[in-house]
Regions:
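A short glycine-rich, Lys/Arg-flanked "PGG" loop and its adjoining helix->strand segment in the class I
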Residues: 175-190
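A short SAM/SAH-binding and catalytic strip from SAM-dependent methyltransferases
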Residues: 160-174
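Class I SAM-dependent transferase core
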Residues: 30-87, 93
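Conserved class I S-adenosyl-L-methionine
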Residues: 192-217
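Core SAM-dependent methyltransferase catalytic element
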Residues: 228-229, 233-246
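Helix-to-beta-strand junctions that scaffold the AdoMet/dcAdoMet cofactor pocket
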Residues: 89, 112-113, 171-172, 185-187
């Protein structure tokens, strides 16, 4: 009987590769969540991660850019009223967090000709859309910024206003992002949080993509920002204003 002498070597090599490429128990397991988060079974539209009793929703992503830019959005959401109530000054520096396709970014840029708008998003594809628009519109005061799930990548104490429109509920790390927003705001600066009203069953949006005023204030107040007021000016959304103490 002929024996292939190379076979034992091949088998040994294969075995060693299997052994040394297997993940160890420590690397195979995910790092435990910080105490302020809880992991539970996920619902259809959530990620199974909870913050202050709220399940965090899945992210819409760049495939939803068309919905953000839909022709009927202004009439449905009265985005014109939203922008008017920001009461911006021409030299304000604004951070549009979760900027998406830049729907608000470029509208804001027109109102702050001596200021700047930081369009922050974690999606390179969304930022690609914004960069293309910036060139087309020659919006020199728009700065696209690639953020992370925990950082804005904006200098501390540098912006007068942070705007988040229907984005906060998707943040996978809301506490860390809230802390980052606090750091980015100048003393006296404001955060305007826009979220679909959880309290209104007639708002035709999935549950996890809505937030109640009470829950929103609870979460944002944990950052050190102070709730100032909630304006009842939009047909479907809360317009909540927070400020950073001087």
């Amino acid at each position: 009987m002929h024996v292939n002498k190379a076979l034992p070597v091949f088998l040994l090599s294969t075995l060693l590769n299997l052994v040394f490429n297997l993940p160890t128990n420590s690397s195979a397991k995910e790092a435990p969540l910080p105490a302020h988060y809880q992991q539970k079974e996920s619902s259809r539209d959530g990620i199974g991660k909870f913050y202050m009793g709220r399940e965090i929703s899945k992210v819409m992503g760049h495939l939803g850019a068309g919905w953000l830019e839909r022709s009927g959005r202004e009439a449905e959401e009265r985005t014109d009223i939203l922008i008017e109530n920001l009461k911006l000054k021409p030299d304000d520096k604004i951070a549009d967090i979760g900027a998406g396709s830049g729907y608000f970014t470029f509208r804001l840029a027109k109102l702050v000709p001596q200021g700047e708008v930081y369009a922050v998003d974690i999606s390179p594809q969304m930022l690609g859309i914004i960069k293309a628009k910036k060139g087309k519109l020659k919006a020199e005061n728009v700065t696209p910024v690639l953020g992370t799930t925990t950082e804005l990548n904006i200098e501390d104490n540098s912006v007068d206003c942070v705007l988040m429109v229907d984005a906060y509920h998707e943040f996978s790390h809301p506490k860390e992002m809230g802390d980052a927003i606090y750091r980015a705001l100048k003393p006296g600066g404001k955060l305007v949080l826009i979220e679909y009203r959880m309290e209104d069953p007639l708002v035709p949006i999935k549950k996890l993509h809505k937030m109640s005023e009470k829950q929103s204030i609870r979460e944002i107040s944990a950052t050190g920002l102070v709730w100032e007021e909630t304006l009842s000016v939009l047909p479907q959304q809360h317009f909540m204003v927070f400020s950073k103490p001087n």
